[in-house]
Amino acid sequence: MTDLTLKALAAERQVSVDRLVQQFADAGIRKSADDSVSAQEKQTLLAHLNREAVSGPDKLTLQRKTRSTLNIPGTGGKSKSVQIEVRKKRTFVKRDPQEAERLAAEEQAQREAEEQARREAEEQAKREAQQKAEREAAEQAKREAAEKAKREAAEKDKVSNQQTDDMTKTAQAEKARRENEAAELKRKAEEEARRKLEEEARRVAEEARRMAEENKWTATPEPVEDTSDYHVTTSQHARQAEDENDREVEGGRGRGRNAKAARPAKKGKHAESKADREEARAAVRGGKGGKRKGSSLQQGFQKPAQAVNRDVVIGETITVGELANKMAVKGSQVIKAMMKLGAMVTINQVIDQETAQLVAEEMGHKVILRRENELEEAVMSDRDTGAAAEPRAPVVTIMGHVDHGKTSLLDYIRSTKVASGEAGGITQHIGAYHVETDNGMITFLDTPGHAAFTSMRARGAQATDIVVLVVAADDGVMPQTIEAIQHAKAAGVPVVVAVNKIDKPEADPDRVKNELSQYGILPEEWGGESQFVHVSAKAGTGIDELLDAILLQAEVLELKAVRKGMASGAVIESFLDKGRGPVATVLVREGTLHKGDIVLCGFEYGRVRAMRNELGQEVLEAGPSIPVEILGLSGVPAAGDEVTVVRDEKKAREVALYRQGKFREVKLARQQKSKLENMFANMTEGEVHEVNIVLKADVQGSVEAISDSLLKLSTDEVKVKIIGSGVGGITETDATLAAASNAILVGFNVRADASARKVIEFESLDLRYYSVIYNLIDEVKAAMSGMLSPELKQQIIGLAEVRDVFKSPKFGAIAGCMVTEGTIKRHNPIRVLRDNVVIYEGELESLRRFKDDVNEVRNGMECGIGVKNYNDVRVGDMIEVFEIIEIQRTIA
């Protein structure tokens, strides 16, 4: 082998020359860039690198590269594109467990030693401060008592001298008597002075004792758990007690300086060192300078004797940092408290109200929960709904399995042809109609029966009073029939069963009754509560009996609603019309909806600019149980949202914006954060193929149903990802999104506009139009099946029995065989079986018949077989020849 130069070896290994030189030096080989490297030196370097890899710590390096395009505007209105590449690299190192335990033990020992030293220093300072405070208090009491006694004695002497002068001016006859009175007065005055002196001394001693107790209480820190917030040390308390007398002597003279001293002192040892420097300078100056000792800067903050409990006001959501500010503690303490509760958070993470309440109460604070929807409640309560309730028409939902004749039954009742207008003859929207009969008005909701429209059927059951369950007499109970029964039971509404297609020869209504009885739907003649009516939507049989049964059930329910006042209702369906804007189909429940009313509908609001009934006719008002289409909303509301008429458009806008913000905050608060464990789990899963789809449909319910159906198709190998979805035609924005994400554009009953078609043609995007949900789901299944890896299957094509063994100088042992089954083909994989046990698996190398090489030998013929790299062939062995075929898998 030709020796490589070190520079060529570095290029081959994709490392720098300097690093390779260093690696050779570490391995004990001195090389330069131009030296040649022999094979022995390569082996030495490889052994050295393997030793380092084994002895070094386990490392995992993750590299990520992201490319994007930035458009920069230039001169002349032109813009240029700049390619931006962001590279990220992270390395995770696994520590040695023994080293980690040793470091943890050293840190624990150091913390315990520091804690012990701190406790001893605090106790020593506390004892010294207490003794000094008691001495100062006793000396002060003695000085005050002595000074007061001297003053009172001087006053008594002065009074005695005045009395003596007066005696000399009076008559000599009264002198003796007055001397006796003066002596008596002097004795009483001395007793009174002594009594007052004793009382004063007792009072001063009591005051000194009380001051000593206060100083002792102040200097002793309470065993509060978190004391690091206040940064007040015991030495500062001792200095404060030492200078207390000096501050009292200074009085008003030092007030100005004390005001400056009340500023917050610096924390930690810097504050102590500054105070020590001030005292040292005062001691060096001496004389008058010493008097300024009492005005040195002191910490003006008094440490609370116990933890301060606050009233913490918490809204719907709050960040960890805001919660810490409300409790006047550090954010790290809140994070520590949440870690004890089992939640790992950051200081900027949003948490919900329940979590914040739990943390605040755990830290000893009182929680006040703030209702952020006060404006919404005020707007909802300010409605005119005080009128009396009147009887209203029932709302009836037609439910059942697909193709059981729900829409055809409703067609006959309405005497129109609605089913022919639906694509594929199946209902894909909720239709709302009201019908005038001889006995009164009935409002019908026609729901889809296809399996994809589960949420639509659930909404129909929630908005209804009576459910008409349509079951085909020739088909019986089907999966969507069972689901409709469950929706009706969940909504708590009565069920009227319409057994349809009774005119068919194979109709069996008794079978329908037996099957429905298994799910709790019993006919009245069997002692149940459900009415069974035999109808035929084609011939019109039993339609009048069905309407009578519906009205009878409505009379039993005694349905009433307020007809006068501000209306409220529910959105049955919504879509975006190109000419009219957002359109919502609303079923009025209470009150009367007028043209021009201000409505609040979920995240949207607006003024009703126009109303149309199900026939497309303009109407000015709609009462209870009447379905109408309204125009004028700010956006397309979600199907199922509550519609409420309010007084003030400005307040309606504020409530709608608040709901949007609240929805976003709650979504962010509950969003799961990706953890390191999940990252490693995703790495082990391997590559998962994704089918990206941008979905646009004509109504909100179809978007919801198609999205749910497509997401349910996902498997472990291929996943469906809805990149974007919405109501309305395919726009240029949708096409750009599909191009950026390599997605399929799917339009359900909508088309692409001119600008979108240009982008689609330029980017060669895959655009597909559908009008039936069956076809859409089937084609997405086919696209997903193409991404599945094929299944490999082994198929046995021939079996030969070894009758004799020959030796060949070229191929070794040659088995003389008789083909007993199938065909033996050359160069196919084989298995050698001995006593029906596989002992070798390899390849058929040589196949001969009468010394001629052949490609295959059929059943019943003799041949010679040479097995590649195998010579242990014995008489009686079986040689099994098979081939591997690929089977294309499909999504079930």
Curated annotation (Swiss-Prot):
Region annotation (Disordered) ranges: 88-305
G4 as annotated region, ranges: 500-503
Start and end residues of each stretch annotated as G2: 425-429
Compositionally biased region (Basic residues): 254-269
Entry keyword annotation includes GTP-binding: yes
Alphabetically ordered keywords of this record: Cytoplasm, GTP-binding, Initiation factor, Nucleotide-binding, Protein biosynthesis
Principal place of residence: cytoplasm
InterPro entries for this protein: DNA-bd_dom_put_sf, EF-G-like_DII, EFTu-like_2, IF2_assoc_dom_bac, IF2_II, IF2_N, P-loop_NTPase, Small_GTP-bd
Cross-referenced HAMAP family: IF_2_B (MF_00100_B)
Similarity annotation: Belongs to the TRAFAC class translation factor GTPase superfamily. Classic translation factor GTPase family. IF-2 subfamily.
The protein's name in its UniProt record: Translation initiation factor IF-2
Protein's organism: Salmonella paratyphi A (strain AKU_12601)
Gene: infB
